[in-house]
Amino acid sequence: MFGGDVSAASVLPSHPISGSCDGFQAEGSDHHHSTMTPFQESQRNVYQILYGHPANDDFPRPITPLQITIPEGDASPTVPVSCGVVNGKMHLNLFMCPGIHQPCIEVGNDLLSPKQFTIRGDKERQKDWKASIRVGRSSLRTHMEAMTIDFYEHMNRCSGKCQSRNYVNAPSEEVLQARKSKRTSEAGQLKYEIENEMAGKEADNDDNRKSAKKARGRPRGSVNKPRQMVKMEPQDDRFFEEFFIDAPPLQSMSSNEEPTSSNKESNECTPFNDILNCLQNDPMNFWSQMQQTGVIGHFCDDIIVSAINLKQSVMDNPVTPTTANMLTRTAFALGIPPVVVHRVQSIERNAYQQRKHDEMFNDIQSTLAEEHSVKYQPRTSSSSQESLHTAREFTEEKVEELIDVCKYDDYPESECLPGPSHIQ
């Protein structure tokens, strides 16, 4: 990029590199050390800075050597950057916080901002503009996270808009160790919870426990909420001991008779009739125990699923006396009879209003039809009658004229006035 061999070595210049190079971290940094190999090119000093990484560094990615050009005078030092197929030089003293809209990249005779530089390199669709700009084989974000490149005088000129990724205020070693220990404790707690959950279901199956998949880690910042474990008393063999208070005594068995399978099951759990008896006769006791053990939500889900199935059955099939009684009992059990009554009244009101609306619409249609018939039919009949009357009067007048002429008696020719033929 610079037209010279970077590996060529020469004598170090006498002036230090700390005066005008505030945009990058030079030697003497607490976290990174560097070895510099300068060479001469077109009366400018170009240094290849190699940054090492300590053992406890939080950035394990390798960073390519950073080539910084130190011009003579007060000009800004530059580093070669690229974006796609476009190459340029970033002026470190012009790279100010937050950087995205600061003209600091020289491309030919233009001074572009990083945003304009990514647009020219056809990388504007990427959300992370720092990752789109390359400094050698590493991205600009990698160098900024490693503190090899920073905004110019960032401590004094920070705009407060650069904290989105929090790479400027790098966490200290104590904070990193606390985060690692927290993640380790969270992973251990999650593993302990999974083992406790699996212990109740697969206690007698060690092979399944070994072949179980490991749980994936949760995102940073998430908190593992403690699960509601079932409160089982280890010294009590029976889970719900209150179920046995009103239970009838078991039938006596002969000493020679071996216990049946039902008796074996009764030792493991409460008999079916005892639980059903408690559910029907002592619901307060039953549901209190369900709430205390943390399993009452499962029964509520079962009730909801049963209600959905009942709804689907009623909508798809004709109503039977069984389903009708079930719906009525459910409505009264849930305390919604007033809601049902109000809903029926609302449906009736809507039907009545619709019926009145239809009647009003029909009346309007009939009225308009009558007005239309009255408006056009009388005019046609009156005009025809007037025409007929006029024709009759005209005929009568003609007939009268003819009759009057015919009534005259014949006069002798001597009494008649001479006509036009006699005029000389």
UniProtKB/Swiss-Prot annotation:
Sorted UniProt keywords: Chromosome, DNA-binding, Metal-binding, Nucleus, Transcription, Transcription regulation, Zinc
Domain SAND: 65-150
Biological process according to GO: positive regulation of transcription by RNA polymerase II; spermatogenesis
Entry GO CC: autosome; nucleus
Pfam families, alphabetized: SAND
Subcellular location: Chromosome; Nucleus
GO molecular function, one term: DNA binding
Protein's UniProt name: Transcription regulator spe-44
Organism: Caenorhabditis elegans
